[in-house]
């Protein structure tokens, strides 16, 4: 990796105010300096979460609704912990117990959520674009916790923060020169899309690897190098990010068999040796051990960053909630914030 401490040109000043977005619906809406701003805002929460006293009252009196229309464990738990550590009242709404199961439309749901006068709504939905639609119908900030095959912005942010910590880069640093290989179901993965957007914006060299049937046709237009040969994609990589096969989004037969997929695209200790000697391994979860990643790799004591990703996820989500609720809290400078989606 070269140029490990590239300064963040055009970054907001220390304690900067003007984060111009009311909502966070995707990485695609953010400029490079805005991504860096959120990463840097998360640093204070990384430190707080490592203390015995992990809570603050910054969001005291505010209500956050986690509206999850798609099953989730780690993302929902991460957002719930983030909100509670900031002092907010957090309410979780699960699709299985919601009126959506009874035929309520998404617009009706949005109107209902808006009438509850929440101060922020976190949404996860199986349909691409659903989060943006709800954001257009409510009066409070909306955070995208994953929508269909579109985006998962906080996952990309936590992944970038994890990489920055693993490479021992200080606050304000981008990822210029970092070589990142992402392997798995690129076609159906919102995590891949959001990571590609954030990593290329931060200066990383991104390679994506997948079987031909799981590689988007237009992927090179996103500024990445596509591979179908995993061994070739690993050469020189500093970070190897594995993605699971998203069987729930597949309508046909995309791979011959799990066994054949593991043979060609599974990350084993032998295959990891083709990357840089000190390369790190990441996975957004949930993992399919023995298919896209071996347990010996996933659980490696020094090279696996998987549990650190979970740790950084809480800090990133605390940062996003704190920044997007400044308007509701009348934090100094809030007038300059929340102007656009």
Curated annotation (Swiss-Prot):
Its EC number is 2.1.3.2. InterPro entries: Asp/Orn_carbamoyltranf_P-bd, Asp/Orn_carbamoylTrfase, Asp/Orn_carbamoylTrfase_sf, Asp_carbamoyltransf, Asp_carbamoyltransf_Asp/Orn-bd. The keyword Transferase applies. L-aspartate binds at residues 102, 190, 244. The gene is pyrB. This is Aspartate carbamoyltransferase catalytic subunit. Pathway: Pyrimidine metabolism; UMP biosynthesis via de novo pathway; (S)-dihydroorotate from bicarbonate: step 2/3. GO terms for molecular function: amino acid binding; aspartate carbamoyltransferase activity. HAMAP family: Asp_carb_tr. Carbamoyl phosphate binds at residues 74-75, 124, 152, 155, 285-286. Catalyzes the condensation of carbamoyl phosphate and aspartate to form carbamoyl aspartate and inorganic phosphate, the committed step in the de novo pyrimidine nucleotide biosynthesis pathway. Pfam families: OTCace (PF00185), OTCace_N (PF02729). Keywords: Pyrimidine biosynthesis, Transferase. GO terms for biological process: 'de novo' pyrimidine nucleobase biosynthetic process; 'de novo' UMP biosynthetic process; amino acid metabolic process. PROSITE patterns: CARBAMOYLTRANSFERASE. Heterododecamer (2C3:3R2) of six catalytic PyrB chains organized as two trimers (C3), and six regulatory PyrI chains organized as three dimers (R2). Belongs to the aspartate/ornithine carbamoyltransferase superfamily. ATCase family. The keyword ATP-binding does not apply.
């Amino acid at each position: 990796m070269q140029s490990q401490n590239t300064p963040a040109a055009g970054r907001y000043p220390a304690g900067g105010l003007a984060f111009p977005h009311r909502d966070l619906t995707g990485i695609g809406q953010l400029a490079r300096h805005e991504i860096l701003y959120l990463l840097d805002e998360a640093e204070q929460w990384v430190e707080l979460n490592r203390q015995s006293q992990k809570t603050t009252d910054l969001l005291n009196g505010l209500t956050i609704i986690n509206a999850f229309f798609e099953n989730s464990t780690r993302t929902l738990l991460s957002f719930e912990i983030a909100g509670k550590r900031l002092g907010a009242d957090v309410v979780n709404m699960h699709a299985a117990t919601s009126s959506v199961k009874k035929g309520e439309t998404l617009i009706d749901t949005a109107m209902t959520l808006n009438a509850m006068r929440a101060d922020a709504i976190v949404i996860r939905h199986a349909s691409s674009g659903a989060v943006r639609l709800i954001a257009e119908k409510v009066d409070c900030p909306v955070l995208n916790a994953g929508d269909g095959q579109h985006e998962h912005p906080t996952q990309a942010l936590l992944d970038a923060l994890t990489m920055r910590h693993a490479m021992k880069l200080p606050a304000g640093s981008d990822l210029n020169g970092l070589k990142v290989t992402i392997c798995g179901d690129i076609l159906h993965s919102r995590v891949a899309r959001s990571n590609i957007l954030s990593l290329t914006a931060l200066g990383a060299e991104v390679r994506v690897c997948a079987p031909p049937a799981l590689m988007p046709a237009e992927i090179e237009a996103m500024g990445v190098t596509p591979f179908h040969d995993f061994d070739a994609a690993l050469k020189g990589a500093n970070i190897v990010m594995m993605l699971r096969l998203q069987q729930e989004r597949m309508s046909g037969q995309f791979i011959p068999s799990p066994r054949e997929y593991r043979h060609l695209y599974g990350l084993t200790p032998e295959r990891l040796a083709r990357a840089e000697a000190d390369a790190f391994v990441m996975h957004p979860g949930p993992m399919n051990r023995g298919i896209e990643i071996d347990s010996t790799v996933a659980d490696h004591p020094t090279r696996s960053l998987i549990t650190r990703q979970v740790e950084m996820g809480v800090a990133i989500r605390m940062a996003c909630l704190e920044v997007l609720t400044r308007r509701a809290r009348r934090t100094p400078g809030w007038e300059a914030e929340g102007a656009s989606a």
